[in-house]
Amino acid sequence: MSTIALPTPRRGHSKGIHPSQIVAYAIVLAGAVLMLAPFYFMFIFATHSDREILSLPPPVWFGDHFDDNLKLLLERLPHWWHNLGWSVYVALAVTAANLLLCSLAGYAFAMFEFRYKKQLFLFVMGTMLLPSFVGMIPTALIMSWLGWMNEPKALIVPAACGALGIFMMRQYIASAIPRDLLDAARIDGCSEFGIYVRIVLPLIGPALGTLGLVTFIASWNNFMGPLIVMRDMEMYTVPLALRSLQGTGQTPWGAICAGSSIAVLPLLVMFALASRRLIEGLTAGAVKA
């Protein structure tokens, strides 16, 4: 009687963590700690007096001077709450304008054929090569000629549309929306604007969320723009208002940290609202269909 040798089962891969994974996790953790440390100490210093902040070693846990720092902040910046609301208004207006104009421009570049399309797109992309400070003086002169100095239009209009946003929208629309879908809508009698509103906008939600969050943060952190076109302290945005506290005798570091801690809250709210869209937008195209 012959016997049949059964094949020896191969040993599966070990389910343990590979040493290279441990190293990778350690590097990521170290990077996260380095990035979060300034925010941690900002919140800590907001609750301590200047004397405690400048002591060695510096405090590493919360104190009980936040109310004093906030009171000092409001004394030095009597328009602080107006500055905060003003910054929110400008950032939201710039974000809304970018979402509308960049999505329209990206839709046109992705789905329409028109004369000098390639040249115009290359020109728009070429503006990304110019450093931002190159346009500061021309922008200030134009705002002065138009009589927009110290007005919200001086901050909103120049930032209403950007090359990066147009590029993001164009690439996403070209890869996520099939032309056959738009042709079918045209056959059904839908107008071009109706196609944009009813078909394009719902399908580019992840890209809009990413662009909106990036634009809001950039507008919120904008320092040079308000510095050039705003004259009254009441019209200062948050970064400019906090910067004005330096150079006025003894710098109130506790008050600055308290104001910075308050200024971070709108960014956290925006990130919480748009984080899902941000992740979807960043991972779009990473998985091949």
For the regions a protein language model found, what residue spans apply to each?
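Short, Lys/Arg-rich, polar N-terminal cytosolic tail immediately upstream
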Residues: M1-G16
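A structural signal for multi-pass alpha-helical bundles of membrane permease subunits
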Residues: I4-L6, S20-A289
